[in-house]
């Protein structure tokens, strides 16, 4: 006779199952398990008197014959493609399978074979997401990387050379010398890294040199002169070498207006940074570019979400980052032209509509590198409060909204930069960059981070304690942070041309180097759950934003979740 167990006891033992709902941190967002790939009564769980023992849940199968290196049991997977309960197998640092783990000799429908060579990570009661991807990094200081990793980010793309004045303002690693040194520096960090060259040159040879040196993309920034001619020159090189172009457009409209930039882009694929405009771009109407099919629009996190403090903090940040002088009236006017309540409010709604597709940090250059995931889900929470459930959702759950927002920091930046074959989602064959969250700490503080199949970061107690849990408990680097494990668990993204020219070997790189690919044939329709193309207009006098004739506006929040409740210092 089968044993019956109530839902609450089952969830406490094996994690939530189909139909169970989970609250995300202290937000008003709730997810509901859509499907459970484990088998009731045949679940695997590790521990004394539990299932994963020799001859029971652990088989006699060797690693060579198919046993996985690591199994994650009973995890609640949250990804763009679904919110499901499953076991996850990892082998050779990659996701081997998502399904049912166990011993095929005594259990049915086993997709993931557990053997003596298999380690176990208990996923019960945890949300599992893909490692997040931040595509707007100013590499100002190396300490950013640990901060980002501790927040759940496992891939960082951007530019810079350290705290140089140019890097403080722009995400460019200019020239082959600096690109080479940054690629060599990347060897030291447990993070997937890639670097953008400076895209501002009408002489294509300057751009080609950087791509050949290993740049995985090119960045056009107004502080270096983003004119129609440099835009065209940069995109010509990108099309030839299959790298992405990121753009920060001309706030002052000196070389033309947003229409002139759209004309210069000429239908070619481009990733627009801080597309609302507070981070920079044609004032006041750069936001309308999100309606172009070839444009992959992103936000940076200082304007995420719109709160009562958003406008006040921006002016000083902007003056510092862009090397402006508060004694010069023109510099003050430049800064003030970028900070508009109306467009920031509209940005919230455009994200909720799926018209803005990506969220990144703008690290130490107005943005906060450790708050990308937090700010993303604060925005989702705000929009639920102010706009109610999406049409695809119900009063029971916010699954579609949550999948839309997780896509903005995982799969969509991966697609935009040609690395989605390797990272950006929990799918068979991809690198096992995975983040575990307690639901009460979701999007705030990860419980554990797996990098290339090995544990790289975890909440950990006193190392001198008799068990792992006594305080002080805080995030600490784990073994994949060190030595050759670091080298083999993390990756560097370069242009295909540079790999073909043996640049990794010439520079003495030990990390596995991966070529970006398919950056030029994509458009917004390829971005998951965030491909809406609204017809945007901006009133030049009031800065009010309209989508297909409808005013987009919302009020700022006085209080956000995932904030002081979690950060006491």
Curated annotation (Swiss-Prot):
It catalyses: urea + 2 H2O + H(+) = hydrogencarbonate + 2 NH4(+). It comes from the Bacteria. Binds 2 nickel ions per subunit. Pathway: Nitrogen metabolism; urea degradation; CO(2) and NH(3) from urea (urease route): step 1/1. Its cofactor is Ni cation. One of its GO terms (molecular function) is nickel cation binding. Substrate binds at residue 221. Belongs to the metallo-dependent hydrolases superfamily. Urease alpha subunit family. This is Urease subunit alpha. It comes from Prochlorococcus marinus (strain MIT 9312). The gene is ureC.
């Amino acid at each position: 006779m089968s044993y019956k167990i109530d839902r609450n006891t089952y969830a406490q033992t094996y994690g939530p199952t189909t139909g169970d709902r989970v609250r995300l941190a202290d937000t008003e967002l709730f997810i509901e398990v859509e499907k459970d790939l484990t088998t009731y009564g045949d679940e695997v769980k590790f521990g004394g008197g539990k299932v994963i023992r020799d001859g029971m849940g652990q088989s006699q199968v060797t690693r060579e014959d198919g046993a996985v290196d690591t199994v994650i049991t009973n995890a609640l997977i949250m990804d763009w493609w679904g919110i499901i309960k499953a076991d996850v197998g990892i082998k050779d640092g990659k996701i081997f399978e998502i399904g049912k783990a166990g011993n095929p000799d005594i259990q049915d429908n086993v997709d993931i074979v557990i053997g003596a060579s298999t380690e176990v990570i208990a996923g019960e009661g945890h949300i599992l997401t893909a490692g997040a991807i931040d595509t707007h990094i100013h590499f100002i200081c190396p300490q950013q990387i640990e901060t980002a990793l501790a927040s759940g980010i496992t891939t960082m793309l951007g530019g810079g050379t350290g705290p140089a004045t140019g890097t403080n303002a722009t995400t460019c690693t200019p020239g082959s010398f600096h690109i080479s040194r940054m690629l060599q520096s990347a060897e030291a960090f447990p993070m997937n890294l890639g670097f953008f060259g400076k895209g501002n040159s009408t002489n294509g040879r300057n751009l080609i040199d950087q791509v050949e040196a290993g740049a995985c993309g090119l960045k056009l920034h107004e502080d270096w002169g983003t004119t129609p001619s440099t835009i065209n020159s940069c995109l010509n090189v990108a099309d030839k070498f299959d790298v992405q172009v990121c753009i920060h457009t001309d706030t002052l409209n000196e070389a033309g207006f947003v229409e002139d930039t759209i004309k210069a882009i000429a239908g070619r694929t481009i990733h627009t940074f801080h597309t609302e405009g507070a981070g920079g771009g044609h004032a006041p109407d750069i936001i309308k570019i999100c309606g172009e099919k070839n444009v992959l629009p992103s936000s940076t996190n200082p304007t995420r979400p719109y709160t009562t403090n958003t406008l006040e903090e921006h002016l000083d940040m902007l003056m510092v980052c862009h090397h402006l002088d508060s004694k010069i009236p023109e510099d003050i006017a430049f800064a003030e032209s970028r900070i508009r309540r109306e467009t920031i409010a509209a940005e919230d709604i455009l994200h909720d509509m799926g018209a803005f597709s990506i969220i990144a940090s703008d690290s130490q250059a107005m943005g906060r590198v450790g708050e990308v995931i937090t700010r993303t889900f604060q925005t989702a929470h705000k929009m639920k409060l102010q706009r109610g459930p999406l049409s695809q959702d119900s009063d029971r759950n916010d699954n579609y909204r949550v999948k839309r927002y997780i896509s903005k920091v995982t799969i969509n930046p991966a697609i935009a930069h040609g690395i989605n074959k390797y990272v950006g989602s929990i799918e068979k064959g991809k690198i096992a960059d995975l983040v575990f969250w307690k639901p009460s700490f979701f999007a705030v503080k990860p419980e554990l981070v797996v990098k290339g199949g090995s544990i790289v970061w975890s909440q950990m107690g006193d190392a001198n304690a008799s068990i792992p849990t006594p305080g002080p408990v805080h995030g600490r680097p784990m073994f994949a942070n060190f030595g050759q494990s670091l080298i083999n668990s993390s990756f560097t993204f370069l242009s295909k041309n540079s790999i073909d020219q043996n640049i990794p070997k010439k520079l003495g790189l030990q990390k596995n180097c991966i070529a970006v690919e398919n950056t030029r044939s994509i458009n917004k329709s390829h971005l998951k759950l965030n491909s809406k193309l609204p017809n945007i207009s901006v009133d030049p006098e009031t800065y009010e934003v309209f989508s297909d004739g409808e005013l987009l506006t919302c009020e700022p929040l006085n209080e956000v979740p995932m904030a002081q409740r979690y950060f006491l210092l």
